[in-house]
Amino acid sequence: MKKFLIAILLLILILAGVASFSYYKMTEFVKTPVNVQADELLTIERGTTSSKLATLFEQEKLIADGKLLPYLLKLKPELNKIKAGTYSLENVKTVQDLLDLLNSGKEVQFNVKWIEGKTFKDWRKDLENAPHLVQTLKDKSNEEIFALLDLPDIGQNLELKNVEGWLYPDTYNYTPKSTDLELLKRSAERMKKALNKAWNERDEDLPLANPYEMLILASIVEKETGIANERAKVASVFINRLKAKMKLQTDPTVIYGMGENYNGNIRKKDLETKTPYNTYVIDGLPPTPIAMPSESSLQAVANPEKTDFYYFVADGSGGHKFTRNLNEHNKAVQEYLRWYRSQKNAK
């Protein structure tokens, strides 16, 4: 009986020693430095087991030997709540850091910045150049993308199927495996809400038949001025001209209508050439927006300043001088030309 008890005691001591040694090895293992390259990303697929994770760590050369990892995750189940995704290893120093990151679910974020006043053509280039974004639209026409975005019928000639103006300018974050269409849908939803809000809060006497006309005019205001406190005044000029049945005569629409033929200059011939967008020739608004307007431009059109201005011209300081009639406008143009020549001669 005594020998049996001694054997049991020895076995307990051995097991305790093994457990203690194993715990020590696990403690040391989590301190193992991880070999991380600059800007390295690690993708964990859904359903990855602890043994597959160990193999992945070895294949990615993060650690030399991963055989202890499955045992560690059994010993510390709180570390085995790993979430699928793609992670930046920028701040990972040890195995413990790596496991903490994978358990956090904090995937790496990328972003694409879409600027107000740019066109859908510009934004498509931004999408195509966005890193780690799944490209599903590269071979799609603008008309096909229009259909995929499920845009509302609020006055637009749907035969045109033009995405222009329908996307909300902002910085959009995304994770790897996100698609370009997902980003466009997020942007389109925000623009729908912003446009609906502006339309519902608009002045009652606006000469605009529907929200789409508001979107068109907001895009023109966006292109005409980058100064926030000028937008409502610029909008008032166009609203006044529409009410008076005057042509809008705004250069950005001419440029948009010229497309690839625009080389940085507008000639008299260009102002006289009829295109759907040449507001020196056509009456009223062009058929579609000419750029992506900001929400502040939408609000400026919805609630323009109450003015009797019908003209404006650059004032040389980045802003504009607003005038009531053609005579005042011509004088303002001459003032600007004198300023321009003086600046040119000073160089």
Curated annotation (Swiss-Prot):
It comes from the Bacteria. One of its GO terms (molecular function) is lytic endotransglycosylase activity. The keyword Transmembrane applies. The keyword Lyase applies. Its main location: membrane. Keywords: Cell inner membrane, Cell membrane, Cell wall biogenesis/degradation, Lyase, Membrane, Transmembrane, Transmembrane helix. GO terms for biological process: cell wall organization; peptidoglycan biosynthetic process. The chain crosses the membrane at residues 4-24. The record marks E224 as: Important for catalytic activity. It catalyses: a peptidoglycan chain = a peptidoglycan chain with N-acetyl-1,6-anhydromuramyl-[peptide] at the reducing end + a peptidoglycan chain with N-acetylglucosamine at the non-reducing end. InterPro entries: MLTG-like (IPR003770). GO terms for cellular component: plasma membrane. It is a single-pass membrane protein. Its EC number is 4.2.2.29. It is found in: Cell inner membrane. Pfam families: YceG. Functions as a peptidoglycan terminase that cleaves nascent peptidoglycan strands endolytically to terminate their elongation. Belongs to the transglycosylase MltG family. This is Endolytic murein transglycosylase. The gene is mltG.
